[in-house]
């Protein structure tokens, strides 16, 4: 199987006033992995992951708080988060975001 997803096929989800996700590869395509371009311009409330997540920062000047530890990320950095981690963020970023399994699919 293969699937090409064009930019005009993405589905944009408004997570909050300052946080959006342009979803390209979703659980409707495959339950194994999802891919989005996420953007933050401000403060992200704490959340707990139910899946593994990787951020590749296209542009970034952002501080994450991960299980109480501050982690600063810049453009070109990669951040891996294991499932069950509680994290929040403050700053600005645009990132390719990959979830395994696909976002919204329980392990």
List where the protein language model places each region.
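Short acidic-glycine-tyrosine-enriched beta hairpin
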Residues: 67-84
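Short histidine-centered beta-strand/loop micro-motifs
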Residues: 26-28, 43-49, 90
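Short, charged/polar surface micro-motifs in flexible loops or helix N-caps
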Residues: 30-32, 41-43, 59-62, 101-103
């Amino acid at each position: 199987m293969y699937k090409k997803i064009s930019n005009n096929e993405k589905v944009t989800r408004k997570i909050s006033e300052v946080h959006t996700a342009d979803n390209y590869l979703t659980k409707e395509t495959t339950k194994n992995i999802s891919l989005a371009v996420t953007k933050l311009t401000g403060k992200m409330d704490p959340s707990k992951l139910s899946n593994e997540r990787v951020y590749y920062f296209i542009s970034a000047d952002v501080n994450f708080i991960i299980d109480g530890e501050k982690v600063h990320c810049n453009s070109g950095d990669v951040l891996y988060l294991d499932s069950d981690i509680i994290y929040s963020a403050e700053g600005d970023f645009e990132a390719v975001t990959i979830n395994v399994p696909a976002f919204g699919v329980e392990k």
